[in-house]
Amino acid sequence: MALWGGRFSQAADTRFKQFNDSLRIDYRLAEQDIVGSIAWSKALLSVGVITELEQQKLELALNELKLEVMEDPEQILLSDAEDIHSWVETQLIGKVGDLGKKLHTGRSRNDQVATDLKLWCRQQGHQLLRTLDQLLNQLVNVASEHQATVLPGYTHLQRAQPVTFAHWCLAYVEMIERDYSRLEDAINRLDTCPLGSGALAGTAYPMDREKLARNLGFQRATRNSLDSVSDRDHVMELMSIASISMLHLSRLAEDMIFYNSGESNFIELADTVTSGSSLMPQKKNPDALELIRGKCGRVYGAMAGMMMTVKALPLAYNKDMQEDKEGLFDALDSWSDCIEMAALCFEGIKINGERTLEAAKQGYANSTELADYLVAKGIPFREAHHIVGVAVVGAIEKGCALEELSLAELKAFSEVIEDDVYEILTIESCLAKRCALGGVAPEQVAYAVEQAGKRLQERDNAGVKVRPARLTDLDALEGMVAYWAGLGENLPRNRNELVRDIGSFAVAEHHGEVTGCASLYVYDSGLAEIRSLGVEAGWQSQGQGKAIVQHLVEKAREMAIKKVFVLTRVPEFFMKQDFIPTSRSLLPEKVLKDCDQCPRQHACDEVALEVNLQEQVIIKSSVA
């Protein structure tokens, strides 16, 4: 079903339709389109376009459709709809009839697709942050294990000075951390909601766009409707960040390909990331790394194509902008795959420490040490540089290393050279002298490894925050509540109940992933109950449950609620947060009635605890 047919007296040519349709690309925005539509239905309710009953029917049908899409997203491609917006609307009308035709009131596909795309970019951006962290952890772990593994450092692909394998890993840690920082900044910049901007001049309905933005999890609404539908900066910025990061990954891959070669033999990749030759049975090819290097150009091409597409577009939506998604999807998919594969290449990697040490001793990599030695003896550096160059030529002619020349032979190049020269020509001395911050001295490398690990841990800890639940959290909430209900720890809640009570829930979020939840159910008597508290497996004992409870108690205090209570089998947890035991008989009748849903109702072992918020206020006032 086309969304624009009334103006036309002839059907579109099938060739034009095929050329014009974008469903095969933008079907990936199905969940975002549905979530945006649910939020829009609430906005329409707020301005009286639809009734509360109509909004509930729309929301229920859209949630059903979302579940169907999650179970089988490929079903969308069987349709001949023009785009994902047409498909969602057609499916909705099929579920609720003409009511579905009301949903697009006051909305344009221009602000609709802009919102869908930002929702997708935000979600994908958070996932990419997690993937980058996985690679960083791998690099730091390998660095920690190989702080003492000497590696030749290169300039112009010629041996220059000795470093360590840890130092090499940490160089890429710095690069990938810059990628992480750029991506964080970009996610923050794109976190504005275009919905309600209409085609270009804004919606004609007086809805609260800031509230609409918050319902979709955005920081705020966009400030200019014309810019809102014209803006694709976030697409280009993400592709630019992906391109820079792919450059780093390509350099990483190139280094490792060289280190893995028979000529170097510094490392051996695991069989799991290599392949063989169809002709030469001895081959073990670093295909994973070569593909990372190869896909770099693919991401660059997508970015360049997008910039060329928008460089001369007039403001507001133009059909050219339909081309934004294919390149974006492919670029971010490729980037994500390459980050994951780079991390995988460090699993099972073997470093040939004997070979790297042997290589580091070759190529006169200690020449700079001899020059510094002469400087310490009072010879100007430029003159010392020349003397050492002549000495290297002499060693090459003799076929030996600098440290293998006799003292008499060394004195022939400079009389100031004494027996103590041999100590400074060792690999250990070469490394130890580079003791300034960022150098290869053992203490500096150890410090860098420690600091990198701390940064990762701090970021991991800081990534957890508690906030009010949103419609976009519904799937995570449903799964978590069902998990704990299945264990008999919480009461079961169906999806419709969760949708209805979404405003009572708070969630713990770790880098965009919901990891814990609970709700605050308010009774008429000025009491409130903490329900459905649960934390994802793997995230327990990390303070998330405590943070959620504190958030809900503070919310209750702001609402002037007198007491908050809980029924629990782990009273110790709540007592650490100022809850005290109370009698179940003092609880409202409705609480005990809700227990009818509990599978343990006839053998209840839950303890009732409460926190008196009024008493806390009195105590604080007295202390003050």
Curated annotation (Swiss-Prot):
Keyword tags: Acyltransferase, Amino-acid biosynthesis, Arginine biosynthesis, Cytoplasm, Lyase, Multifunctional enzyme, Transferase
Annotated segments matching region Argininosuccinate lyase: 1-466
Pathway(s) per entry: Amino-acid biosynthesis; L-arginine biosynthesis; L-arginine from L-ornithine and carbamoyl phosphate: step 3/3
One Gene Ontology molecular-function label: acyltransferase activity, transferring groups other than amino-acyl groups
Subcellular location(s) per record: Cytoplasm
EC number(s) reported in the record: 4.3.2.1, 2.3.1.-
A GO CC term assigned to this protein in UniProt: cytosol
Domain N-acetyltransferase: 464-614
GO BP terms in the entry: arginine biosynthetic process via ornithine; L-arginine biosynthetic process
Pfam families: Acetyltransf_1 (PF00583), ASL_C2 (PF14698), Lyase_1 (PF00206)
InterPro entries linked to this entry: Acyl_CoA_acyltransferase, Arg_succ_lyase_C, Argininosuccinate_lyase, ASAL_AGS_AcTrfase, Fumarase/histidase_N, Fumarate_lyase_CS, Fumarate_lyase_fam, Fumarate_lyase_N
Record's catalysed reaction(s): 2-(N(omega)-L-arginino)succinate = fumarate + L-arginine
Region annotation (Probable acetyltransferase) ranges: 467-624
Transferase is among the record's keywords: yes
Family to which the UniProt record says this protein belongs: In the N-terminal section; belongs to the lyase 1 family. Argininosuccinate lyase subfamily.
Protein name: Bifunctional protein ArgH
The species this protein was found in: Aliivibrio fischeri (strain ATCC 700601 / ES114) (Vibrio fischeri)
Gene of this entry: argH
